[in-house]
Amino acid sequence: MTIMRKTHPLFKIINNSFIDLPTPCNISSWWNFGSLLGVCXVMQILTGLFLAMHYTSDTATAFSSVTHICRDVNYGWLIRYMHANGASMFFICMFIHVGRGIYYGSYMLSETWNIGIILFLTTMATAFVGYVLPWGQMSFWGATVITNLLSAIPYIGTTLVEWIWGGFSVDKATLTRFFAFHFILPFIITAFVLVHLLFLHETGSNNPSGLNSESDKIPFHPYYTIKDLLGVLLLLMVLMIXVLFFPDVLGDPDNYTPANPLNTPAHIKPEWYFLFAYAILRSIPNKLGGVLALILSILILALFPLLNSSKQHGLIYRPITQTIYWIFIANLLILTWIGGQPVEYPFTMIGQIASVSYFSIIVILMPIASMIENDILKLHY
């Protein structure tokens, strides 16, 4: 008798994606972050759903409805902080996932990579509109400052901003529509995730050696289901330590003050996972230039498959590019730090140097290093 999971039209899809999927036998723990992102997305949708049952998207009651969730709803505080810190875990996993893709040359699976970039942008949009919902000071001013950047677009900018706001300032209409966006976007993300997996399973996974693994594959279950389960347990452990002991460590104290359009916070800054892009935005004195740099800081990822000229797959046997890669990671951490600092000397100067370095490393240094390594290979063989 044939096994049902191999013949049933619905179970067959699940079977071919998560059970009998041929997987390279040597993929390391850096490959766990894809499944961890899936777990994060499910957790965010579930906690978000329960929060939405008690939240009201009205400027008069939004802040107090979040307070009500934390004080009066059974385990509301837990759901709220799991959702807030779950977003941080989501981005940590995403940064590592992208970093692993760059290190091991996974960007050569270009369809999967490009869908990944779209996923990254959609997740950033979801997190941004979500941050506005508690209607604290940083929510309000963050929304005002970031949406106002669109006014830099020539000719249609001002009209576009007022259209997004639903008026002449961030107000009731803005909050209501941001709640609607925040509710729908995770489902759009889920659809993109399925497309991401579809393209991945067309080509098969990359692996740490960068070699073809067609001749040496093992079934996904039980080997990688167990491995992923360990990753999930570690993720949940770190998340719950953050939620139960340090729930506000990644938040902003200003967001515990209700939104007040008449009082501007001393330092307006977004959540920590946007700080690198925010630092790049601030490092350019021109408004339109800053907005373009902000967008390019993410879209530049799409250049990786085009700029790759190396004869080897991944950086595992490429010491020069490897060194540049780790300088790039350090530079990204510097940008994140600068994004949270006030706009004054020496932070502005450091931010400008780090911003130029960010683009230079990707567009100039890495391709040059690849060419040098190719020449070294020719000398040896």
Swiss-Prot record:
Amino acids binding a ubiquinone: 201
Gene3D superfamilies: Cytochrome Bc1 Complex, Chain C
Keyword Cytoplasm: no
UniProt xrefs under InterPro entries: Cyt_b/b6_C, Cyt_b/b6_C_sf, Cyt_b/b6_N, Cytb/b6-like_sf, Cytochrome_b, Cytochrome_b_C_euk/bac, Cytochrome_b_N_euk/bac, Di-haem_cyt_TM
Entries under Pfam families matching the protein: Cytochrom_B_C (PF00032), Cytochrome_B (PF00033)
Keyword annotations: Electron transport, Heme, Iron, Membrane, Metal-binding, Mitochondrion, Mitochondrion inner membrane, Respiratory chain, Transmembrane, Transmembrane helix, Transport, Ubiquinone
Residues the entry annotates as binding heme b b566: 97, 196
Residues passing through the membrane, by range: 33-53, 77-98, 113-133, 178-198, 226-246, 288-308, 320-340, 347-367
Primary location group: mitochondrion
Places the protein is found: Mitochondrion inner membrane
A GO BP entry: mitochondrial electron transport, ubiquinol to cytochrome c
Residues involved in heme b b562 binding: 83, 182
Membrane protein topology class: Multi-pass membrane protein
Record text on cofactor binding: Binds 2 heme b groups non-covalently.
GO molecular function annotations of the record: metal ion binding; ubiquinol-cytochrome-c reductase activity
Cofactor requirement: heme b
GO CC annotations on file: mitochondrial inner membrane; respiratory chain complex III
Function: Component of the ubiquinol-cytochrome c reductase complex (complex III or cytochrome b-c1 complex) that is part of the mitochondrial respiratory chain. The b-c1 complex mediates electron transfer from ubiquinol to cytochrome c. Contributes to the generation of a proton gradient across the mitochondrial membrane that is then used for ATP synthesis.
Note: Heme 1 (or BL or b562) is low-potential and absorbs at about 562 nm, and heme 2 (or BH or b566) is high-potential and absorbs at about 566 nm.
Quaternary organization: The cytochrome bc1 complex contains 11 subunits: 3 respiratory subunits (MT-CYB, CYC1 and UQCRFS1), 2 core proteins (UQCRC1 and UQCRC2) and 6 low-molecular weight proteins (UQCRH/QCR6, UQCRB/QCR7, UQCRQ/QCR8, UQCR10/QCR9, UQCR11/QCR10 and a cleavage product of UQCRFS1). This cytochrome bc1 complex then forms a dimer.
Family indicated by similarity: Belongs to the cytochrome b family.
Protein name, per record: Cytochrome b
